Amino acid sequence: MLNALYPLFRPALFSMDAEDAHHFTLNNLLRAHRMGLGSCIGNRIAEDPHTVMGVRFPNPVGLAAGLDKDGAYIDGLAALGFGFIEVGTVTPRAQPGNPRPRMFRLPQADALINRMGFNNGGVDAFVANVRASRWKAEGGVLGLNIGKNADTPIERANDDYLYCLERVYPHASYVTVNISSPNTKNLRQLQGASELDSLLSSLKDAQQRLADQHKRYVPLALKIAPDLDADQIGNIGDALVRHKIDGVIATNTTISREAVKGLPHAEEAGGLSGRPVFEASTRVVRALRGVVGDAVPVIGVGGIFGGADARAKIEAGASLVQLYSGLIYRGPALVRECAAALRG
């Protein structure tokens, strides 16, 4: 039902402040789920299992991190038919993020700009929300996305990632390490060769220790930016293989404004997502696959607005795909369309 109604609701949602509409939608989605209306709002999607990173995904279409930063809406989002859901980014301590307004629509380009700044309630509250999720308890595939606090010096970033990994590890199907948001000062420096080597080495040591402690291996994925040249992609790919990282998510938002020049809000600071990032993110997927071969699976995200876009990510070398901005513009019908395009 929601698939048919969303195009009617969208003008009202788009008349609201973007962040207010975001929370309004999530709150009502969760409320409908709790009222037992899941069959009315949900997508029933046929099983199309994919095993990636050693994890069995019921279908290859997931929700990207950022929509549910605190893991508070997992059960409502699960009704939309995703094969997996990624929540976060979470940091060790609660932080408010950047001042509002910090999210902007560019409807002429099917795009969003955000400078949220990892606003979240901290990792302890995050874990409590994850533990309360019925969908997770019933075996849903849940990725937990971790980052660093804004006031943590970049030289001590590893400490924040290790702190979060320690706490989320027992509750995750996989853990994503976000080093590519443009909205935390200097964060993308961690994509540099020496910084990345240090971080990945520390994380792999911790992963092995935690696997021994919990008697369960939880894969690690790295989320990278689209604004990378061939040498940078090569260096990152080599590091992923060398450190035996389990997966890579390509990509985060872009700082480029080339595709939206002259549009309202185009010069707002932050990361641009949506249709304009499709080509850049797909280029990174293809280039990464060329570097890592079959050693590291790629999850493709960025600008997926239809089944053909999802298929293009897979053809470029992705094993799974994730949605975010396309979901805002197209609604939950996009999940079903992408799953159908990738089936078989």
UniProtKB/Swiss-Prot annotation:
FMN binds at A65, G66, L67, D68, K69, T89, N145, N178, K223, T251, G274, G303, Y324, S325. Its EC number is 1.3.5.2. Substrate binds at K69, N114, R115, M116, G117, F118, N178, N183, N252, T253. Pfam families: DHO_dh (PF01180). One of its GO terms (biological process) is 'de novo' pyrimidine nucleobase biosynthetic process. One of its GO terms (cellular component) is cytoplasm. One of its GO terms (molecular function) is dihydroorotate dehydrogenase (quinone) activity. Its main location: membrane. It catalyses: (S)-dihydroorotate + a quinone = orotate + a quinol. Its cofactor is FMN. Binds 1 FMN per subunit. The active site is at S181. SUPFAM superfamilies: FMN-linked oxidoreductases. It is a peripheral membrane protein. It is found in: Cell membrane. Catalyzes the conversion of dihydroorotate to orotate with quinone as electron acceptor. This is Dihydroorotate dehydrogenase (quinone). It comes from Cupriavidus taiwanensis (strain DSM 17343 / BCRC 17206 / CCUG 44338 / CIP 107171 / LMG 19424 / R1).
